[in-house]
Amino acid sequence: MAKGQSLQDPFLNALRRERVPVSIYLVNGIKLQGQIESFDQFVILLKNTVSQMVYKHAISTVVPSRPVSHHSNNAGGSTSSNYHHGSSAQNTSAQQDSEENE
């Protein structure tokens, strides 16, 4: 497995397996929403009212509607993760603002 996919595949697979609604932002700013039906090395099949094949090179960000556990028990790498959910980053920013005002 390529090093770049050691985080990508377990994350996308957890979103697919748990049928988590996602927002996918493309590099041109368009927001797509749906559930990940399938994916491979180059594309993600996103299902909403219709299925769309979205090329990964056009994707900027994948945002799950809720936190997911994406650690793979059979992966050869470490179980620690550098991935942070969007809400955590927002909370950290709000905490910093609060601390600065005190």
Swiss-Prot record:
Entry keyword set: RNA-binding, Stress response
Residues covered by the Sm domain: 9-68
Record-level GO BP terms: regulation of DNA-templated transcription; regulation of RNA stability; regulation of translation, ncRNA-mediated
One Gene Ontology term, aspect cellular component: cytosol
GO molecular function: RNA binding
Cross-referenced Pfam families: Hfq (PF17209)
Bias (Polar residues): 70-96
Region (Disordered), start-end ranges: 63-102
CDD domains attached to this UniProt entry: Hfq
Keyword Repeat: no
InterPro entries in the cross-refs: Hfq, LSM_dom_sf, Sm
Highest taxon of the lineage: Bacteria
Entry function: RNA chaperone that binds small regulatory RNA (sRNAs) and mRNAs to facilitate mRNA translational regulation in response to envelope stress, environmental stress and changes in metabolite concentrations. Also binds with high specificity to tRNAs.
HAMAP family the record matches: Hfq (MF_00436)
Oligomer and partners: Homohexamer.
Family: Belongs to the Hfq family.
Protein name as it appears in the record: RNA-binding protein Hfq
Organism encoding this protein: Escherichia coli O17:K52:H18 (strain UMN026 / ExPEC)
Gene name in the database record: hfq
